[in-house]
């Protein structure tokens, strides 16, 4: 898999389809043939085999192909407005969010907000959250009381790639994990 191709697809399908003249539908889908043509016209060589390889080999399953293989979209992480069409689902009692310790103070004061994305991303396990936090510096894992949030009327969605999504997490539902190491996974 080409990392450059994966980054290009993430940029175009999550954040800037207009950068190559691509149009996403309301659920974030793009026509594969149109994507390939516009990628090549913009100077990014891409064929169908290469595209399918990136989709198949992405360890984080960032992209989803439609059942007929004619459309593609990012599984989650959009900054452009899309409705992934996922129904709200009941989450597990706890979810996890990984971040860097330097971001901890404002998070504990204001809660988790989506920032430039449409929704907050949460993990079902501590190990994944820890890996996410390590990308940004010294990691810390936050435990989200998802069960109580759900009971209080907050909605959760499960993306195609297993990432949990919600609009925001108020600080009152957050606890700092006493041990942010992977071996304490729940």
UniProtKB/Swiss-Prot annotation:
One GO BP annotation of this record: tRNA splicing, via endonucleolytic cleavage and ligation
Keyword Transferase: yes
Pfam families from the UniProt entry: PTS_2-RNA
Keyword Transferase belongs to the record: yes
Molecular functions (GO terms): NAD+ poly-ADP-ribosyltransferase activity; tRNA 2'-phosphotransferase activity
Protein EC: 2.7.1.-
InterPro entries xref list: Ptrans_KptA/Tpt1, RNA_2'-PTrans_C, RNA_2'-PTrans_KptA, RNA_2'-PTrans_N
Record keywords, A-Z: NAD, Transferase
Cross-referenced NCBIfam families: PRK00819.1-4 (NF002014)
Function: Removes the 2'-phosphate from RNA via an intermediate in which the phosphate is ADP-ribosylated by NAD followed by a presumed transesterification to release the RNA and generate ADP-ribose 1''-2''-cyclic phosphate (APPR>P). May function as an ADP-ribosylase.
Protein family (similarity comment): Belongs to the KptA/TPT1 family.
Name of the featured protein: Probable RNA 2'-phosphotransferase
UniProt organism field: Agrobacterium fabrum (strain C58 / ATCC 33970) (Agrobacterium tumefaciens (strain C58))
């Amino acid at each position: 898999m080409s990392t450059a191709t994966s980054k290009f697809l993430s940029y175009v399908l999550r954040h800037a389809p207009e950068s190559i003249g691509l149009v996403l539908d309301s659920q974030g889908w793009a026509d594969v043939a149109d994507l390939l043509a516009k990628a090549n016209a913009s100077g990014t060589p891409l064929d169908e085999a290469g595209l399918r390889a990136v989709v198949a080999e992405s360890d984080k399953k960032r992209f989803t192909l439609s059942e007929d293989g004619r459309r593609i979209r990012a599984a989650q992480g959009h900054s452009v407005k899309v409705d992934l069409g996922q129904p709200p689902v009941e989450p597990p009692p706890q979810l996890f969010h990984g971040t860097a310790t330097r971001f901890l103070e404002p998070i504990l004061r204001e809660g988790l907000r989506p920032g430039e994305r449409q929704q907050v991303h949460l993990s079902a396990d501590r190990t994944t959250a820890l890996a996410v936090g390590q990308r940004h510096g010294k990691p810390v894992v936050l435990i989200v009381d998802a069960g109580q949030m759900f009971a209080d009327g907050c909605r959760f969605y499960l993306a195609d790639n297993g990432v949990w999504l919600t609009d925001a997490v108020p600080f009152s539902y957050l606890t700092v994990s006493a041990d942010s190491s992977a071996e304490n996974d729940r």
